[in-house]
A protein has these predicted regions:
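N-terminal presequences and immediately downstream first alpha-helices
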Residues: 1-36
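N-terminal cap/lid segment of alpha/beta-hydrolase-fold proteins
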Residues: 24-63
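Phosphate/oxyanion-binding active-site loops and adjacent basic polyanion-contact surfaces
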Residues: 46-50, 81, 119-123
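Structural signal for hydrophobic/aromatic residues that build the beta-strand cores
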Residues: 54, 70-71, 99, 126, ...
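Short, surface-exposed "cap/lid" segments of acyl-processing enzymes
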Residues: 59-113, 128, 132
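Short amphipathic alpha-helical molecular recognition features
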Residues: 77-80, 118, 144-145
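Alpha/beta-hydrolase active-site loop
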Residues: 116-136
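Primarily recognizes the serine-hydrolase "nucleophile elbow" in alpha/beta-hydrolase
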Residues: 129-171
């Protein structure tokens, strides 16, 4: 395993200003849960003959996209219907990006066939998902994870080391 190097840091000089019609943290948290758009997508067959569901923003598959693709990994017991997943999808839409929201096993609403569950250290399956997305997408690919999804993504990046750049352009 390669040693983890600290990322270059830069000071953010922008201050967040909430829209007048959406003041306060509570309303900003509730808004995406109430008004975000839903996405749908196909199931992928895994190497162990199970399946993973991946939801895409708009067109159903990223193959024709040259624009950036944002991949959002959900938290514990989350899904593409989690308010934060829909909020990320809305941001991607506003920026003209594609967005993919893969479900970890058992989180898409359907019971999986294989007796395998997801966990925060499952970096192999995370790598498989990212490699499959990279093969299908020609544009820049960025990955983000929320809570457990962030932990699994960073574990994958640490395990992959310099090879991570073959699958993603940014984590």
């Amino acid at each position: 395993m390669m040693p983890v190097r600290p990322a270059e840091s830069s000071q953010c000089t922008l201050n967040y200003v909430a829209p007048r019609w959406l003041p306060g943290g509570q309303l900003q948290t509730i808004w995406p849960a109430l008004y975000s758009r839903r996405v749908k997508g196909p199931a992928w067959t895994t190497p162990d003959a199970d399946f993973l569901d991946v939801d895409y923003l708009q067109d159903g598959a990223p193959t024709e996209f040259l624009r950036p693709l944002l991949v959002v990994f959900h938290g514990l017991e989350g899904s593409s219907r989690s308010h934060y997943g829909e909020a990320f999808a809305d941001v991607a839409r506003e920026r003209g990006w594609a967005c993919a929201l893969p479900h970890f096993r058992g989180c898409s609403g359907e019971i999986n066939r294989a007796p395998r569950a997801y966990h925060s250290g499952d970096h192999e399956e995370m790598g498989w998902m990212l490699e499959r997305l990279r093969r299908a997408h020609r544009g820049p690919l960025m990955a983000v994870g929320v809570s457990l999804g962030g932990n699994a993504l960073l574990r994958w990046a640490a395990e992959a080391g310099a090879q991570a750049g073959r699958s993603v352009d940014a984590v």
